[in-house]
Amino acid sequence: MRFYIFIYFFLFVFSCKQFKPKTEEVKNVKPRLDSLFFEPSKKPIEKKPLISKLELNLIEKGLVNVQDLDSSILIDIKYSSTDNFMQEDMYGNFNKAYLQKNVAEKVVKAQQFLKEINPELSLLIYDAVRPRHIQQKMWNALDMPISEKIKFVSNPKNGSLHNFGAAVDLTLASLTGEALDMGTAFDYIGELAYPTLEMQNLKAGLLTQKQIENRKLLRKVMYQAGFFNIQTEWWHFNSCYRKEARELYDIVE
């Protein structure tokens, strides 16, 4: 009897050792792709930008997004930030450069002319169409005589060419978006921004030759494309005169 008990005990111990999974074998087991513990993707969900009411209104009026015509043109809409003379975000979630179609096509031509001269440079747009109610806020904010005020902001009663989508504020920049030195910042209110006083400011040591050359290059490509500048802002270019704009376009309120 003892002999049979010993045999059963021996077989039991031997069978446990034989079928016990090895530690190394367990470690090497790879999880299946359909495992309940499969790690979810960490890729962020892309949020589609909302189209503002202003942009919908511009599209209905026939204006176009400049970057839809030429995506190489750089955009930094200053009134969609606090980096402007108002120090206020005037446009909210609208941060695109919309212009009348024929005006936008001129900007594209200016970009092409610039690329022919220097492919390492690009136009950088600061402002394009501007609703008249924004123009009114700017007009009200400038505390100076009207004779001085009209040098920097058009009277909203008459309508600025920006209000028609027929003017653009811009500069030159590297392909990384770094603006070239023009001697003043955008929206600088003062004679240092006057194209008509550049040589005078050069002689006075207030502008450098390089800064003036940068301005001249900007004017050159814009002139070639059919724009003309104004006397008090190196960054501002008109596509036509106000009388023509009234005949051709609806003002953006």
PLM regions and their residue ranges:
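Positively charged n-region of N-terminal signal peptides that target proteins for export
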Residues: 1-5
